[in-house]
From Swiss-Prot:
UniProt subcellular location: Nucleus; Cytoplasm, Myofibril, Sarcomere, Z line
Record bears the keyword Repeat: yes
Protein name: Immunoglobulin-like and fibronectin type III domain-containing protein 1
Gene name of the encoded protein: IGFN1
Subunit structure: Interacts with FLNC. Interacts with KY.
Main location, first listed in the record: nucleus
Tissue specificity note: Expressed in skeletal muscle.
The organism of origin for this protein: Homo sapiens
Domain of life assignment: Eukaryota
Biased composition (Basic and acidic residues): 403-433
Amino acid sequence: MAGKLRKSHIPGVSIWQLVEEIPEGCSTPDFEQKPVTSALPEGKNAVFRAVVCGEPRPEVRWQNSKGDLSDSSKYKISSSPGSKEHVLQINKLTGEDTDLYRCTAVNAYGEAACSVRLTVIEVGFRKNRKRHREPQEDLRKELMDFRKLLKKRAPPAPKKKMDLEQIWQLLMTADRKDYEKICLKYGIVDYRGMLRRLQEMKKEQEDKMAQYINTISSLRHIRVTKDGNAKFDLELDLKDSQSKIYLYKDGEMIPYGFNNQTKHCLRRLGKRYEFQIQDLRPEDSGIYQVKVEDAVVFSTELEASAIPPRVVVPLAETHCEEQGDAVFECTLSSPCPSAAWHFRHRLLHPSDKYEVYVSPDGLTHRLVVRGARFSDMGPYSLGTGLYTSSAWLVVEAGKDKDLQSTSADHKLQSRRSGKDGRLDIYGERRDATRSSTSRYKPGTGSFSKDAQGPMGHFSQGLADMEVQPGEAATLSCTLTSDLGPGTWFKDGVKLTTQDGVIFKQDGLVHSLFITHVQGTQAGRYTFVAGDQQSEATLTVQDSPTIAPDVTEKLREPLVVKAGKPVIVKIPFQSHLPIQAAWRKDGAEVVGSSDREAQVDLGDGYTRLCLPSAGRKDCGQYSVTLRSEGGSVQAELTLQVIDKPDPPQGPMEVQDCHRAGVCLRWRPPRDNGGRTVECYVVERRQAGRSTWLKVGEAPADSTTFTDAHVEPGRKYTFRVRAVTSEGAGEALESEEILVAPEALPKAPSAPAILSASSQGITLTWTAPRGPGSAHILGYLIERRKKGSNTWTAVNDQPVPERRWTVADVRQGCQYEFRVTAVAPSGPGEPGPPSDAVFARDPMRPPGLVRNLQVTDRSNTSITLSWAGPDTQEGDEAQGYVVELCSSDSLQWLPCHVGTVPVTTYTAKGLRPGEGYFVRVTAVNEGGQSQPSALDTLVQAMPVTVCPKFLVDSSTKDLLTVKVGDTVRVPVSFEAMPMPEVTWLKDGLPLPKRSVTVTKDGLTQLLIPVAGLSDSGLYTVVLRTLQGKEVAHSFRIRVAACPQAPGPIHLQENVPGTVTAEWEPSPDEAQDVPLHYAVFTRSSAHGPWHEAADRIHTNRFTLLGILPGHEYHFRVVAKNELGASKPSDTSQPWCIPRQRDRFTVKAPCYREPDLSQKPRFLVGLRSHLLPQGCECCMSCAVQGSPRPHVTWFKNDRSLEGNPAVYSTDLLGVCSLTIPSVSPKDSGEYKAVAENTLGQAVSTATLIVIEPST
């Protein structure tokens, strides 16, 4: 049966349309109500009701797996006239009636069918009754054998052990939201430790990456595309474009290419690097790393669960007889819970008709089609999302027409390599010659073919073909014997000559001709002859087409203005699914945001949208439309016009002096798509905000000269390129100063050649530098010494550089200066000359007198002398000091110029070297004869006898307290340095005493003074000649005195009291001491000094008053301090004699002052930092006087050594010397007496210091 399958609005109902077109008012059969599955006990009657519809009224038939229900005593089929309801009643149910019952409604236009299962519940001994169930038993046995076969699969591959270093690299580039998942996957339990280590590793990695990379951004982890490929990408800004990039998988480097022909490929676009993994398989899972040289820059993981399952064992074509069961089986590379079965692109759901099985490992999927009919014939497929495996079910007619019971020989058909006539997992069509005698042998795990029967078979089957639309196609096959004319089918539908095909038979060769192939004629063609059949696929390469007028329009460049949107819509025609790929200058156009390019593919068109066109969008665009039938490409040129870029700089600005300012620039990098017409030049004066247009330069010139500038002013220039779109951005220069015409520089100071009372002759040198090339002459000026007024000597410039000034006054002192004159004007005056007298030349001075050496050192000699005897006109104006070494005959001056005074120190001499010295007087008339010393002077200090520098502040006796540090400096002078020796009591110093001598100072240091350090210390200075000088002083080391002994009081004279005490034990020592006596009149009163500096052991206090108590205290003192006091044990008191008198006390009743405790001032809370002292106080009142007890957190603090409390006249205090956090808490003071108690509480909070 051939036809077209349609859907029903009731699930479980299949409708097969037998004709191409149904006349108006007619329809195929359908069910309004299908029978309901029932489970009834044995002996009951089963009733199935079906309500059918259709025009003309369909005929209803009931069947089961055994055939017709012709036994009228067992089966009763009825329907009411005019009613759509049809009833099947099964009487007296037995276990044999358990079966699948099928209701079929048929009319002239189609067939509708549904199935229902009846289950008979047996009771008693009938449960164990053996029934005839060969087909079911065979099916069950086959399924069990198949399950055993699945259990024999190899154990799963062991899980790959990942390198811990790779896991850390993966964490460094992973998103923070994925940290927890990665840690759980690889068993990292210390999450905080992981974060700390990750931070350290990131710093190390950044330092390492900084050697090769400027920046890295836009990291996108690995993802699987719809094409079954995986890709990941990142943006890298390499410091060196020649740096090598490596790709690693699980720590091993893998090669990659640059096109889609390799397993791993790299695509680069600018700074973006995209890695692709083609043809994903389970073994491709793992951690991928990208390295630049030896630095890891990116890590990502491809999980096995992300790899789409592939078809390992595809579906095989299945043959079964009508009403038989057909089995399809497919094995995947990995479990796929979402795998779905389809029949003619219709999703199949598990039901009584279709049973779906999945092996325990989730790899093998099986579909069982129960009760196959001709309407079930067609392609069945299993889809996993990316991959699909398809095969045909061929339903063959049974051996008799009565629908006899069929054995469930739904055996699996063998899949012949290259001849199974179906799509393999790579989508390639293969030819097949399939015989219905192929059978699957259970338990063998392989396929075989039964022996051929005596009938003919195909010696050459149909072959797959691919043709273009409009071409002719021929499908032919050859039989070994004549099996009749045969029948041609297309997609299961019988073909006739009315379908536009031509059938031919030439002997045993059967052919099908199509003169002009159309896209609708593509499909699966089958030729059936007898029980033999051959199939092939005719593919029409219906490539997409673009209208010629559209192509013609695209040849013209598309011109738009910058900032405007660009929308390019290209319509096309195609009967197959289309993929559109846009490219710009060979690079793929991919848009990811509203500001970038957007590519859209609609129904019959593809569109490229640029929201805001820019100059970077200019270029050659192409779009490739690709389908299974072929591809077509269209190209267009996009031109975006805009204002030009600024001219390229920097702008060269040159001051051409009298010609003006010359500007030079380079043409703009981008002219905006239009030719530059001219350049506009503007300038702005410093301090102003207005730009002034100064001119235009032609397009072929990039120079301009502005002659209208003022010297001495600052200007800024800018240049714009101008096109038909307008003026572009400006190139601005730096600020330039237009320099005025250069004036000559100043000449040097004039030199005096000669001077007399008649005139002074000068000479000078010409100036150098800008403006000094053309000197017209020189102006000479003079002034008197001490005056500020310069007077011109000449009115006209002097061309020579020598001049004699004659207008001078004899005896006056003059200074001169010169100014150069050029065509641009006079320059700056030069510096003045030295002062010179207008007088006749002087006579040389006389000899220097009284030359002598006043001081010497190792490197210097100081001289002094007296001036020569003078007469009028020969006074000395300076002196020249010269030295001559003892090993040389040459006199060398010690200074530059002359010495104006009569003393000089020659420095920088060699120690111990001998020198001859001479001095010469100098004036304007010349030099005098030199005056020299007769003896050789050595550069060495003058001998000074040792002497101590002792003054009135120097002490001969030093008293020091025990334990103090002693420092005794002694100053002296001597030359050369003498030998210094320290002695104590005439003997060398002990080792713990330290002496230091340097630069005329020697010092004694005793770090810790003891009583043994007392004594006479002597410093001895001994010269090289053995002469000695000594200085002595005494050091007394003492301690504070000990306390005096007990004090005894007695009254020797009435009205006085005499205090005597035993002397201090230190009184017998050399240190003098004295005593001080103090008294007070009460036990708590202050002490008053009664006497001081008492050198005896007795003191008498006068003015004793009867009835007063007197307490005495004695303290021993010396110059180092006072001793501890010695007090009287009992005070001194003289009884007061009183006269007797009688007092009559008044009688009164004393009031009752009893009162229970109450707090006048309560405790308050404290907030203190750690380590501070805390004092809590309160005031309590009560009679009898209450007793106060302190508590902390309801625990008594009595006996706690860390705190102490006081109670003074009702003011109670609790003191904690140094609080700590453990002292925080609630404190309570409880006051109690015989009448009651009172409580006051407060809180103490101790703040810990922040770390």
